[in-house]
Amino acid sequence: MIQIQNTILGKIVDRKHEELADRLKQRNLKDVEQWVKEAPPVRGFAQSLRSKRPGVIAEIKKASPSKGVIRADFNPAEIAQQYEQAGAACLSVLTDVDFFQGADENIAIARQHCSLPALRKDFLIDPYNVVEARALQADCILLIVACLSDQQLEEMSKTAFEYDLDVLVEVHDEQELERALKLSEQCLLGVNNRNLKTFDVDLNTSLRLKKLLDPSRLLVTESGIATPQDVQLMQEHDIHSFLVGESFMKQPRPDQAFTELFGVPKLV
């Protein structure tokens, strides 16, 4: 497990504990459970991801801690529509406020303007956050192994399945993958190619960890996919699912950037 103290991830997790305490004061778990009843049905994130090749989770992200504001002209509704028209399988929507300038309401806004399922991209630390994600109209949650204990991973993934949410479990190395594989096979596996300490990107991380998986297990490669050659490299190693944000957000037309990178995905 990567030690996250003195890293940006460590700072984010510290802030998330403060945020959780604040949110619990404003709305307790029972209130959030009531709120869930108003949410529309889930759209089937994993099913949609598997239905296309390449299966692309296209990210709606205004800023990042390392790059600052990536997209000043930020319109989640318009971006969601463009992604759907380009052939994305799913959306990833940042809800973290302090580090990524996201917003909770962006999930519902994006979903209202397209038919794609959405991942709540945030740093979740408690089952409360999972139930909250369902209330916010997410179809899938992200669990980052580097900032969660085995008990948290187990408890939060079970909570997600109870609320019909899909789960994307993110790992950075072999040790984290070993922990992730203890969870239900229903979980999707994501490999983040970015080193949390140096922020360097190495696409070989995905290739290396893919070899340790059963060939039938779907793997999502995350971070650093920037050229058609990167996509081809992954596909040559039987990796057909991608999470891409920055490459799209930096361009005036995210849909055109999508097509330049992936072409037109096909139904499988």
UniProtKB/Swiss-Prot annotation:
Family matches, as CDD domains: IGPS
UniProt entry keywords in alphabetical sequence: Amino-acid biosynthesis, Aromatic amino acid biosynthesis, Decarboxylase, Lyase, Tryptophan biosynthesis
Pfam family, one: IGPS
Biological process terms in GO annotation: L-tryptophan biosynthetic process
Keyword Lyase tagged: yes
Keyword tRNA-binding: no
EC number annotated for this UniProt entry: 4.1.1.48
Reaction catalyzed: 1-(2-carboxyphenylamino)-1-deoxy-D-ribulose 5-phosphate + H(+) = (1S,2R)-1-C-(indol-3-yl)glycerol 3-phosphate + CO2 + H2O
Top EC group: lyase
UniProt pathway: Amino-acid biosynthesis; L-tryptophan biosynthesis; L-tryptophan from chorismate: step 4/5
GO molecular function terms listed in the Swiss-Prot or TrEMBL record: indole-3-glycerol-phosphate synthase activity; phosphoribosylanthranilate isomerase activity
Similarity field: Belongs to the TrpC family.
Protein name, entry field: Indole-3-glycerol phosphate synthase
Organism ancestry: Bacteria, Pseudomonadati, Pseudomonadota, Gammaproteobacteria, Moraxellales
Gene: trpC
